[in-house]
Amino acid sequence: MDEAVGDLKQALPCVAESPAVHVEVLQRSGSTAKKEDIKSSVYRLLNRHNIVFGDYVWTEFDDPFLSRNVQSVSIVDTELKAKDPQPIDLSACTIALHIFQLNEEGPSSENLDEETENIIAASHWVLPAAEFHGLWDSLVYDVEVKSHLLDYVMTTVLFSDKNVDSNLITWNRVVLLHGPPGTGKTSLCKALAQKLTIRLSSRYRYGQLIEINSHSLFSKWFSESGKLVTKMFQKIQDLIDDKEALVFVLIDEVESLTAARNACRAGAEPSDAIRVVNAVLTQIDQIKRHSNVVILTTSNITEKIDVAFVDRADIKQYIGPPSAAAIFKIYLSCLEELMKCQIIYPRQQLLTLRELEMIGFIENNVSKLSLLLSEISRKSEGLSGRVLRKLPFLAHALYIQAPSVTIEGFLQALSLAVDKQFEEKKKLSAYV
């Protein structure tokens, strides 16, 4: 019996013994080197560094070929599911190498002309875009939001590849992120599109991101005719028809759908308003049938999301304000950047929250500054991620105004900036 069990264990694949480690290789914009040559050089680099600790980035290389052609080699996303960085034995892992170059052209506008009106219907990026480089890493969440979203899209690709019967098992390729303003929902959608374009670069040559302008889409101009909506989605269909492209359609503030429906029911808008909303839902139903499209949507007002749209979403993820632990990570990344740029000088080592926990939050010369940052993080709870990323700038502008500052001085300024932010918030709410 034991022998049979042993044979069975050998026959079954053991995923845990050979985890996949994703390595992103940013090729220089002017480089014309072949991907196979870059791949060989990167493998040699990785073979020389068998053990790494969590995510790791190389920007300087002994190999002249890599120096000429590669801007960075990054071991990424190892910390998405693990609470803390873990040592990784690269020799025991399956390496997934993703080589890419950034598109530096910036967004273009998709215009729709209606008589004399020139309506900007959407913004369009070719991915991976220089504008979104580093955005994924800057977003910090308390739950495994990023890993769940990555796994979701990878599963849609797998099910499509295996020709799973969608009549038996349904999936719509629609993601809905909802929560209060300033929590990074739109940024996460853009970062996800960028990340997946890189992750699937061996399958799709490039990505396309279309951000639909909801405010224009549901204005009186668009409400006059569903034909314009059809025309806009036809442009999107043209992009989807290129099977070398992975297409992301981003609809921000999707609660506008509900606003248009309710206005029509109340008699405040012409009947065309309901037709334009139905046209959008119909077009979404048509494009989601294609295997190379993902529809990303956001909403600031959870209770007002149209039920017809909610039913279409495979994932409905709430994105709330960051906790003190997430705020600590956000501030820590800001301080690291300011030390790198020598605005905070001299550089000093800060402990992570996990390291503070391991020493029982005891104050000493090593932990003093990190404990102060932890205290500032706790009193910052209630502020949005958008505000938190602005606070280091405001701290410098309001309380420092010098080319460089010590970390002690900066933390004092940051604490004052947090206090001021809450004071202003209180004053504003008094007038609402």
Swiss-Prot record:
In this UniProt entry, which cysteines form S-S bonds?
none
Regarding tissue, the record states: Widely expressed, including in testis.
GO BP, sorted A to Z: double-strand break repair; female meiosis I; male meiosis I; mitotic spindle assembly checkpoint signaling; oocyte maturation; oogenesis; reciprocal meiotic recombination; spermatid development
MF-aspect GO terms: ATP binding; ATP hydrolysis activity; identical protein binding
Do you know which Pfam families this protein is assigned to? Answer: AAA (PF00004), AAA_lid_TRIP13_C (PF23242), TRIP13_N (PF23563)
**N-acetylmethionine is carried by which residues?**
M1
Q: Is this entry keyworded Glycosyltransferase? A: no
Q: Which GO terms describe its cellular component?
A: male germ cell nucleus
- Which keywords does this Swiss-Prot/TrEMBL entry list? Acetylation, ATP-binding, Differentiation, Meiosis, Nucleotide-binding, Oogenesis, Spermatogenesis
The text of the family note is: Belongs to the AAA ATPase family. PCH2 subfamily.
**The protein's role, per its UniProt record:** Plays a key role in chromosome recombination and chromosome structure development during meiosis. Required at early steps in meiotic recombination that leads to non-crossovers pathways. Also needed for efficient completion of homologous synapsis by influencing crossover distribution along the chromosomes affecting both crossovers and non-crossovers pathways. Also required for development of higher-order chromosome structures and is needed for synaptonemal-complex formation. In males, required for efficient synapsis of the sex chromosomes and for sex body formation.
- UniProt name for this protein: Pachytene checkpoint protein 2 homolog
Instruction: Specify the species.
Output: Mus musculus
Phylogenetic classification of the source organism: Eukaryota, Metazoa, Chordata, Craniata, Vertebrata
What gene is it encoded by?
Trip13
